[in-house]
Structure formats: C-alpha cells, structure tokens
Amino acid sequence: MHFLQNAVVAATMGAALAAAAPLEKRSCTFTSASAAKSGKSSCSTITLDNIAVPAGETLDLTGLKKGTTVIFEGETTFGYKEWKGPLISMSGTDITVKQASGAKINCDGARWWDGKGSNGGKTKPKFFQAHKLDQSSITGLKVYNTPVQGFSILADHLTITDVTIDNSAGTSKGHNTDAFDIGQSTYITIDGATVYNQDDCLAINSGEHITFTNGYCDGGHGLSIGSIGGRSDNTVNDVTISNSKVLNSQNGVRIKTIYGKTGTVENVKFEDITLSDISKYGIVVEQDYENGSPTGTPTNGVKVEDITFKKVTGSVKSSGTDIYILCGSGSCSNWTWSGVDVTGGKKSSKCKNVPSGASCSD
C-alpha cells in the first residue's frame, strides 16, 4: 500500500515537473504584437517574426523572464497614429537582444515628420524605451527612420553594441531624432554605434559610469552632456566619450547646463574625437540655457569639474565657431586640455570664465 501511495506521489510530482519544464526553456516565435505580449512570460527565447505593430500600440516586451533572449527577424513595422509611444518597450534582467541576419526595424518616420519634432505639429511616438533593462545587452539592431527620439535609456549595466540608427531620409523634415538619451542610469556602454540623424547622437542628462566609444555620428547635433539642471537627478559623473567621428553636424562635443539651476558634471572625458564639417560649434560648453535656448548670461549653479578634452580635432565650417566656452563664475574647474586642434571656423570673442589650461583660441 505504501509502495502504491509513493508511486502515485512520484508520478504526480513527475507529471508536474514535466509540465513545468517547458516553461523554463521554451522557445517562442511570435508573428503579432498581441501574441508577444500575452505569451512572453513563458518564453526563454523570443523570436519576433515580421511583426506589424498596430497603430497606437506598443510592442510590449516589459517584465521579461530573467535570462530571456529576444531576436528580431524579418522586418518589424508600425502602424500610423499620432501618439507619444513608445513603439517598443522592454524591461528585465540579463536580457539579450539581437537580430537575425538581414532583419531591420522600420519605423517609417516620414509619416510623422513635419519639421517640428517634439515641439509641435503632429504628436510623434518615441522609438525604444529601455527602462529597467538591467544587466542586459542590445546587439546589431538596424533601425530606420524613427519619428522622434530613438533609445530612451534608464537602466543599470546595459551594453549596446553595433547598433545602426539611420534617419538619413529625415534631413529636410526630421527633427528631435536623438539617437541615445540617457538618464538616471549607471554602467551604460555604447560601442560601435552608427547614427544618421537630426539631433543629438548622444545626450546624457544624468547618470554615472557611462562609456560611448567607436561611434559614427552624421548629420545631427553631436555628442552632448545635458542639458543639466532642473530635473530630479542633475548629476553626471564618470563619462568617457572616445574614438568617435562627428560629421556634418551642428556641434561636435558639447556640455550645456540650465540657467539658474544646480547640479554637477564631473569626471567627463572627450578623447580622440574627429570632427568634420561642423556648422555651429566644434567644442562648446554653455551654462546659459533657459527654455531650451542660450541667453548669453551664464550662471554657476552647475559645477563642471574634472573635464578632459584630449585629441579633439577636425574642421568647422567658416560660418561656425571653433570653440565656445561660457562658464559661470568659478563653476568650471580642473580641466585637462591637450592635443585639441579644431580649425576652419571663427574664434569666439564671447567666451567667459574659461578655466585654466583651456582655450577658446586653439
């Protein structure tokens, strides 16, 4: 009798374990956004096969199981609607995101582009919300024509490698098509990004231990820290931006802070940056932004300290300015300036409170 009872218990437990096992190692292929949303929690490998996301909906990959791999296959597309988005949202821990050979994510942003970006006109959806995508990686995605901003990053230990964002079709009407916006994040690495856009290639609004390297930025507003000030988190610390090219852009490298606000920008390195055909500023540090525009009057509430400009070289158009530094009184300090050679534009006569070692006339 005891043997029979034990056998029944063992059989029951075995059946339960067998039923549970597929949930731990299940590979799933989804062909619709709704199927992905409803089925994602039971999958350890998710293949998104030629998904057409309906208008006004998000490809919802939030709350993924730890260790999930997500593969974009074929062409991912999105229906048209005026809304804020995002088109894709993803969260989880130890997530691997990649694409199959020949795959692409086609946002078809031209349907929204009206030259106004996020400042009016049509309401445009942001592209990819990587919030709480921790200890994870995104590799090799090819993204075309985002309506406005690209990757919104609020994460810890996220590595993005060899991602292409091609908004070159938006040269005339695309606007605010930032590639990577980072806030309240730690240990973010972006390596080998290729970007054609109409706004910042990189914008760091807050965060620590951030690396951007081997980037290629064409057509936008350059590599930016800020704007800093007026947010819940106004600290940027330990940032390295290196071995990158900025071409045909409004700015090369930039730090901008908000007029009358407080915060800290420290331990930031711009190293081995090559500039070409920059239209406005090769190197620019401004502490006078108010309502999104410079005022010409800097304030010193945001400290800009321990900043390195090393081997930042290249050309500015004759209508532009090589270097512009507008610091508040005593707020910019302990800068390292070496191998800087930016030429072709004007020399600014409006620089203020330039820290020792730096120069507006190099």
From Swiss-Prot:
Q: How does activity depend on pH?
A: Optimum pH is 5.0.
One Gene Ontology term of the molecular function aspect: polygalacturonase activity
Q: Which cysteines are joined by disulfide bonds?
A: C28-C43, C201-C217, C327-C332, C351-C360
Signal peptide region: 1-20
Q: Which UniProt keywords apply?
A: Cell wall biogenesis/degradation, Disulfide bond, Glycoprotein, Glycosidase, Hydrolase, Repeat, Secreted, Signal, Zymogen
What top-tier enzyme class does this entry carry? Answer: hydrolase
Q: Name one GO cellular component term.
A: extracellular region
Compartment(s) of residence: Secreted
Q: Which residues form the propeptide?
A: 21-25
* Residues at the catalytic site: D199 (proton donor), H221
Known catalytic reactions? (1,4-alpha-D-galacturonosyl)n+m + H2O = (1,4-alpha-D-galacturonosyl)n + (1,4-alpha-D-galacturonosyl)m
What ranges cover the PbH1 repeats?
Answer: 155-184, 185-206, 207-227, 236-257, 265-287, 299-344
InterPro entries per the record? Glyco_hydro_28, Glycosyl_hydrlase_28, PbH1, Pectin_lyas_fold, Pectin_lyase_fold/virulence
PROSITE patterns xref list: POLYGALACTURONASE
EC number(s): the record gives 3.2.1.15
Per the UniProt record, one Pfam family is Glyco_hydro_28
Where does the UniProt entry place glycosylation sites? N334
Predominant localisation class: secreted
Biological processes, Gene Ontology terms: cell wall organization; pectin catabolic process
What is the annotated role of this protein in its UniProt record? Involved in maceration and soft-rotting of plant tissue. Hydrolyzes the 1,4-alpha glycosidic bonds of de-esterified pectate in the smooth region of the plant cell wall.
**Family the entry assigns:** Belongs to the glycosyl hydrolase 28 family.
Q: What is this protein called?
A: Endopolygalacturonase B
**Organism of this sequence:** Aspergillus niger
Q: Which gene name belongs to this protein?
A: pgaB
